[in-house]
């Protein structure tokens, strides 16, 4: 019997591999020599390759979930660093089907943040679970804040912060920059919310907390008493916890402002949001620039200039002019507002106001310095800064604790003087 052919003596998988290699080697391919392969020589191109130019090899895909470069990326980059104009260049793109394409503006690199997830940061999931279990809402989620991953992502709960939104998740106003749900008749207030909020904050072991709320124009007091009761419950459970309240304007009712201001809070915040000229186009028609100034001014009248810190926030990128920003800062200093923050307006949905300008980080730094030069106690200014910004909270916490220490020292000194006088009298 004749011996089998050499190929037939091989195992089946190996036979298939050799057969596939033989077929592939019989085909003609255009090859592009690589500089890294010195032994590779370019063969004569096939007729098909001579008429069609070889396409440039695409850059490899690369994904990174943080905006901060690692050390190896920093020292190993083969490309030259971008110039300032290149770094701040606003890019556009054409989207849509053929014949109906439209140009859109890409989000600048300095506004991009990693998408938060419970898998990447377990603490994010823990805080979210606590909030759901106690039926609490946060402005971080409702207003789609870009800093939610940073603020909720501390190494432990004491390093994390969350801005609790009281009185539900539905607002009676419809500001053109805000993505919070609106309705003329929101659900009634949750009577357990003050206790649940205090319980959650005591459980986290925070040193500083921010409370805010939707506007509730459907309530006789605008929710002022509910706000004040929540603050009192928090102070009962943890007297050392510093509380910041970011309130609405209570439709200009200064008696309601007084109720919240006297509830034991440490920082009273109310946002003017934008310059006076743009207020009618940006905010709900029931909110006015002058009404907001009266709220902030009345807080100082109730608690005294040194008795409480007042704070406000301004969005940039809505079409405001430089002189209008100057005028706004001067108005705020007239009524002794202590803290101001600047942040980039970012359009939450297509139904909201368009972004007129993406303000560069350098411009934000400039406005921070200008605000400090005007006498503001503190200014947080940056593209991703929001009114309840984590870095700003740390600074204000230090100021408040320093003031408390000074008051305690002054009180102790006064007690010593009184005791000395009483001793002399004896």
Swiss-Prot record:
Keyword set, alphabetical order: 4Fe-4S, Iron, Iron-sulfur, Metal-binding, Mitochondrion, S-adenosyl-L-methionine, Transferase, Transit peptide
Region Disordered, annotated ranges: 27-61
This enzyme's EC code(s): 2.8.1.8
Binding residues for [4Fe-4S] cluster 1: 140, 145, 151, 388
Transit peptide region: 1-29
One Gene Ontology term of the molecular function aspect: lipoate synthase activity
Enzyme class, broadest EC rank: transferase
Residues that bind [4Fe-4S] cluster 2: 171, 175, 178
Cofactor note as given: Binds 2 [4Fe-4S] clusters per subunit. One cluster is coordinated with 3 cysteines and an exchangeable S-adenosyl-L-methionine.
GO cellular component: mitochondrion
Record carries keyword rRNA processing: no
Name of the molecule in the record: Lipoyl synthase, mitochondrial
Phylogenetic placement of the source organism: Eukaryota, Fungi, Dikarya, Ascomycota, Pezizomycotina
